[in-house]
Amino acid sequence: MPGLRAALPAALLLLSSFPPAAAERLPWPQVPGVMRPLNPSHREAVWAAWTALHYINSHEASPSRPLALHKVVKAASKMIPRLGWKYYVHCTTEGYIHGENAGSCFATVLYLKKSPPVVHGKCVHAQNKKQIQEEDHRFYEYLQHQKKPITANYIPDSNGNIAHDHLQLWGLAIVGSSYIMWKQSTEHTGYLLAQVSSVKQQIRKDNAVAFKFIVLLHEIPTQQLNVCHMYLVWTLGHPIRVKYSCAPDNHGLEDGSGQDSGSAAGTSHETKGNF
């Protein structure tokens, strides 16, 4: 069956074009506790919206219809004394896989200095939620009944194409990677899923499904690619459970070996997760 071309959401292209944080200056004094409006296209507004969607994707755990940012409609921020910056965003969303209209979300994102961002969000879905749940259920049952582990490499391929049979695996990778990207995001550093280098199912005897992924995450604004080894466990109706370790990829996207090691801001050799 012909593959589908993986088109980056417009908001991803906008995000990757932003200059480093030092190149921008806020046009007002940074007064603690004072709410300040943000230009919806401002880098921090877009990053806060993506941070919220990473959190929502990892907790809703729907590989059939993960969410991507379409655009930020309205945004504001304020400094919370002794904690950090808190962002308030209203954004429209689209399907991460197909780019269809997916609704809108309201969220707050509090960036802490030594902990993952604290996110509270609520989304209004344009799609039929029951249909999404049924698609997830069919995919889940399909995975549960596998006698031979599912394996795949390079999703999307070097031409940006995704085979139809790999679309939901790509969706599952988005959901799992969203957990990592939420945990690693800061006020000035964001992440996007660039490619699944490899994926292999781990056959289990319980009612969960599990996969080992090697994924490439695009770090913004450094443009660095980070290799993450991700062990994902999915139980239908529950948030994804993820263990991961990440390091820079020195060979680039097309190599996809995921075997290099190193260190960088926002990445770690130490295995982390929510098990």
From Swiss-Prot:
Q: Which InterPro entries match?
A: CYSTATIN_LXN, Cystatin_sf, Latexin
Any transmembrane segments, and where?
none
Q: Region Disordered: list its residue ranges.
A: 254-275
Question: GO CC annotation: what is one?
Answer: extracellular space
The Cystatin LXN-type domain, residue ranges: 32-131, 151-255
Its localization reads: Secreted
Q: Which domain of life is it from?
A: Eukaryota
Name the tissues where it is expressed: Expressed at high levels in the uterine and isthmus regions of the oviduct, and concentrated in the eggshell.
The alphabetized list of GO BP terms reads: biomineral tissue development
Identify the Pfam families for this entry: LXN (PF06907)
Q: Which GO terms describe its molecular function?
A: metalloendopeptidase inhibitor activity
Q: Where is the composition biased (Low complexity)?
A: 256-268
Question: Is Secreted set as a keyword in this record?
Answer: yes
Provide the family line. Belongs to the protease inhibitor I47 (latexin) family.
Q: What is this protein's function per UniProt?
A: Component of the matrix of the eggshell.
Name used for this protein in its record: Ovocalyxin-32
User: What is the scientific name of the source organism?
Assistant: Gallus gallus (Chicken)
